Amino acid sequence: IILDFFSGSATTAHSVFLANIEQNLNRRFILVQIPELIDASKGSEKSKKVAKNAINLLDSMKVPHTICEIGKERIRRAGAKIKEENPEKAQKLDKGFRVLKLDSSNMKEVFYSPKETTQQDLFALVDNVKDDRTSKDLLFQVMLELGATLDSKIEESEVDGKTIYNIGDGYLVACFDQEVSDDVVKAIAKMQPTYAVLRDTGMADDATATNFEQIFK
């Protein structure tokens, strides 16, 4: 695994793709970059022009003016170009990548003293997940907590209108939707996961929650 801190425009990723093709290897990479804004007002005239062109590209993509966005687009284009120029060698080239961002906890602050806690607060804390967090946010948190690597294969399926995530061929199976039915619980059980995770408040009713506990006891 090649690790590149302050990876800029992702030249390392581009180079790894090329080396993998030339040497028939499967090296992987981790790139780390602060989402620094591109400034077209500083530096030489040449660097200003390069920065302006980058900003114009990002505007056309309707994404923020950061070096990270340039890096992501370079990885996409580099992978596509290499596959186009080396159709036979590139058949097994994995040009996919996953973008993760550092953030605060998905959980609400729940450390209150008895004097600070009202009856209304207790009801509000029944579901302690922050309102702006998505199922994917929760999924990656659980993956880290349960020891699944962040590059693990993620498969999505749908049962009874609910999304089920299968991580690492059954190592972890999770569903973070609300109103999860008995059919969803049974579908998860059939996958025989090492770990099965649902939201505390996600069960459709008490009977479903009891069934889940009995199945995975």
Which role does the model predict for each range below?
Residues 10-14:
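Glycine-rich SAM-binding Motif I of class I
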Residues 1-8:
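Conserved class I S-adenosyl-L-methionine
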Residues 1, 19-217:
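Accessory, often C-terminal, charged low-complexity segments
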